[in-house]
């Protein structure tokens, strides 16, 4: 490690990733979070929100394809899509790749961060915000859902993890919130979400989210992928009342990719299916999990990766 | 990061993992490598050889199950097994779990390191070195293979990556070496190996190994898994002249796990199969790779992750 | 910074010194503190107690000569000497260099640490513990002084700084403690002490100690020296009721060094004198300081270097 | 150490100072050096050139008073002053505090860096560049001196250390360069200079500079001070053919400070004098030094702090 500028990210309480910064593009503090955007040699631009890397220029396609397309492809004809969070605009970009989409609403609480992304992160949004089908709402996702009567075919949840007892995102990880999402799904609708890192010493993040979503939806399926720029395996999930998302056949997915003319760089139909096959230790952790996060007793993750429940005192 | 002792591991040339050390159990220098063994809170004991983490107490089962069982399970009745490298003894331990095994020879060049493992790492070997079926040979694997007339049903290669132009392991990554291994396989035999990290900025490590093995064997299949303690995805491969290792049916694997009464913590038959399904970007990297590592022009990996070829000047 | 083992020491809350460890010689936890002893290339062995470097093999002579000889040389004939703290034995070693000394009592609370020093740090004590004039007492210095009726010509205080509200050393930094020391001085006696780092952002440590000692003694003189292995300037002071320690003439000191045949590596009579000349900003900080640390309201230093007073709840 | 941005500065080859950056104000690369300017909590703005901290907002007054006033005060009436280097403008600011000064020429090779300082570092220059007595020349100092016929009463040399064999500053550390400086001194003139860190493991930097200057000037006197923001002791020196700079009486300095109405924050006349009193180990290192840096065989400092001589291949 030569002299110069570095970013410290605490991947676990005991392991820290030190990333060399070639250049700091922007850094600051919105009303909701600290942000840092810098140039790195290995990953291009790197966006950090609060304590954790959010995405990197060179591998964001892996994260965003993994987040978006399983939900979009298990739905036969997603026309109206809601994105909860997703400030950089790349989730929106991937959603809009599906020609079936007529309207994509993105609700993010942090308008200032969205401006940073618009100005400094064109590699992410690639003009998606200007697509006539895109609607950007700057608001708390929960408040938005309580207000709107709109219904969606697909809802994509792209939030940061509820790390820390004072994290306001905790109320977006409760049964009540997932029921609110479900109430805004059209018949046959599906919810896809980023569902926490999967790490030996942090195993309960994903299991608790999975267990909680299960309270709200009939069918819940976890899947995972390795995100290089995070240096971690990440968990995702699909939830639906209409059908079991794991029951899709590879042939159907293959056909939809072709029909919708999707240009994918990471996913294939077989790989999409394989992501849903989980190793034994993770399956066991999912099975034995009993914690359900509720509005009254929402869960949060300690820096040590433990899941705890306590009332949220905004 | 509190005051105290830390270990710096350069995961890439631009990203360094800083691991908190609770206690240093042993550190030193054998004729072949530096070693560090320390206690960490998240992963238990951590073994570092030269620059890179080798395995950690708490997740070594993931690495060793992933390395050993695909090869052992695709073979109908592995009786004689050769392990190249594998100093800690956990590869040996996993091999010996198969009741079909009559003799397991482990050849490691670094006798001093094996002694460190025997004394300080019982969680890894769990007495495997004392199994009457185990034979430990302290020697250069290549010299051993050139000398011996023994034939094996399965050969497991568990070496460190050939990072650096002066790395003597380079001569264990050539077509000639793989042919030498093949020459010591019984009919129907299979080779399994650790085959390099899979990382955006280091993509060519695994592709070059894959491409090179393909010169020596009729059937070569890559697979991958995330190793939490490495904070990376790692590549592995199976090679055989007798059969396509990816053509096994899930049912057969399932049956063999049951018949051999294997106690596995991470692998299941479906997950084992899913590890062989690779994402599009990696498939493309494998396809377009043309570099073949030879004795005359063995490849090595630069710290930047580039693959280069140059004669080895021991 | 190559791969390997490092020690993190937080020199300030915003600046951390990362020291490369070639080898960890010993580390552990006594009932009173964490200790780390390691080999470094630049400074030889380095001893860390809790959060801070205590001394290093290659420059400990600078620290210990600076701490011990001003007090010993301003006294015309130091026969009986008390050392408060000083676990490594080098303070004792320097005291015993004065042939006038008949008895040197060292009181350190941490017997386990003294054992570590005896076994692993011979470069420090150089056999001082075996000198027939040396008496080692393992006890709390305050309890010892309350118990003993002995009187001393010189008392050397060699303690760690009272960083942190729960630091038991706080009660060894109060007016009452300094009065207790004074009560054990023979007529004409002098107290010398390590009195905290002198750093822009930590200015109040030394001023508060200075101001507090002034409550107990008629004459108090601060001096300072740069300790390379600490990467800091450190403050020291002499206190006496009998004479002004800054009033010594260079000639007298020169003569005493010669008479006592002192082999010094860092100090000379002129340099000893020059250490008492302080820069303007430090003089102003000493003058304007008003905080007096008392048993009822002992001071402590926050990690930010602020001095605060609060009752000590052992 | 919380998550966030840090700067790594290698104080020695084995010790690295990690400084927390609150905000990066500017960073870039001029034709001559890398620069980083950031905000820190403990020291305010911090300027790094290439590998090392250059000065910090909160303690630059210590460095610049130490560099400038000994030379200026030992001269009875400095009217014309030359500054070699000194990009930030604070050396110029201190020089201009002396009302005797009629013209102060600052020659710095790096015009781009001077622009950065003008725009982002007003706390340093405080408008000094706009003083009608100030003349800024962007040029190599050696070329400038070879060209000009001007003579000066005081020359202040404020350069970075010649670390690294390819460092162009090496030719500003030779006997020939010092003779060139001398040739531009008026009768009775004096040269003052920053003369390298003084550190146990880097002892030869200052001794070699001292020894080399001694070849060019009749009287050479080293002095030192601790620079908090560098976490090091730094060496300086005065050189003159006219008089011994260490022979000034405290009273004369005191009187000149008063007459010139100098507002000093760190220096006093006694402290100025005390800085010239060196400890025994440093005196011995100066005495035994034999290396003389010449144009044919200029010295440089290795990262390990060793002094070496070799022809410079620009």
From Swiss-Prot, chains A, B, C, D:
Residues 4-241 form the PABS domain. It is an enzyme of class 2 (transferase). One of its GO terms (cellular component) is cytoplasm. It catalyses: S-adenosyl 3-(methylsulfanyl)propylamine + agmatine = N(1)-(3-aminopropyl)agmatine + S-methyl-5'-thioadenosine + H(+); norspermidine + S-adenosyl 3-(methylsulfanyl)propylamine = norspermine + S-methyl-5'-thioadenosine + H(+); S-adenosyl 3-(methylsulfanyl)propylamine + spermidine = thermospermine + S-methyl-5'-thioadenosine + H(+); S-adenosyl 3-(methylsulfanyl)propylamine + spermidine = spermine + S-methyl-5'-thioadenosine + H(+). It holds the Pfam family Spermine_synth. Its main location: cytoplasm. It is found in: Cytoplasm. Spermidine binds at residues 64, 88, 158-161. Keywords: Cytoplasm, Polyamine biosynthesis, Transferase. Its EC number is 2.5.1.104, 2.5.1.126, 2.5.1.79, 2.5.1.22. Optimum temperature is above 80 degrees Celsius. One of its GO terms (molecular function) is spermidine synthase activity. S-methyl-5'-thioadenosine binds at residues 33, 108, 140-141, 168. It comes from the Bacteria. Disruption phenotype: Cells lacking both speB and speE genes show defective growth at 70 degrees Celsius and significantly defective growth at 78 degrees Celsius. They accumulate agmatine and N1-aminopropylagmatine. Optimum pH is 8.5 at 60 degrees Celsius. GO terms for biological process: polyamine biosynthetic process; spermidine biosynthetic process. The keyword Transmembrane helix does not apply. The keyword Transferase applies. PROSITE patterns: PABS_1, PABS_2. Belongs to the spermidine/spermine synthase family. Involved in the biosynthesis of polyamines which are thought to support the growth of thermophilic microorganisms under high-temperature conditions. It seems that long-chain and branched-chain of polyamines effectively stabilize DNA and RNA, respectively. Catalyzes the irreversible transfer of a propylamine group from the amino donor S-adenosylmethioninamine (decarboxy-AdoMet) to agmatine to yield N1-aminopropylagmatine. An efficient aminopropyltransferase activity has been also observed with norspermidine which produces thermine, and spermidine which produces spermine and thermospermine. Homotetramer. HAMAP family: Spermidine_synth. In T.thermophilus, the biosynthetic pathways of spermidine operates via N1-aminopropylagmatine without the production of putrescine. This is Polyamine aminopropyltransferase. It comes from Thermus thermophilus (strain ATCC 27634 / DSM 579 / HB8).
